[in-house]
Amino acid sequence: SVLVALRKEVFEIVRHPFSRLSKSLVVATIPTCLIVLVLYPLITQSFEGAILPICFLITAILLLTADFFVKHKTFVHSPGISYKQALIMGIAQGFATLPGISRSGSTICAGLFSGGDREKVAKFSFLMSVPIIILSMALEIFKLVRLGEFPSVNVAGLIVAFILAFVIGVVSI
């Protein structure tokens, strides 16, 4: 849905792989990957136990604080996301791999706290998800192939879930 809703930006990235936007996505992706490598054991075990409610609480505090922060701040017009903002948003995305922490919520909050414009930060946040989703899918496929395990999948259910997620995603963005 991100690829469709933000197709103009996606085409810019494809046509100009060394543009500022493309470089900003790389800057955001690197810290996310590094944090995931460090936190991976915690991520895989955190669906159980006390960490989930703590992460929900962190998300709630971030969203409430960002809402207050944005209402009481005037933003300077900027041409786009700075590399510093991309780095900060990438760090937030890395920690958002913990269950209970909203990826888009935390990256948008990080972008706003670092002085970004709400609309630009939101678009960049959604674009940031694309490389991470692709890398995550590649990692999971690699693990399945390496282990030689291919779970049985309800294809019809998967197609329905994909279509619903796609439609809701496009409408939401």
Q: What are these language model-derived features?
A:
Residues 1-173:
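Multi-pass membrane proteins that catalyze or facilitate reactions on polyprenyl-/lipid-phosphate substrates
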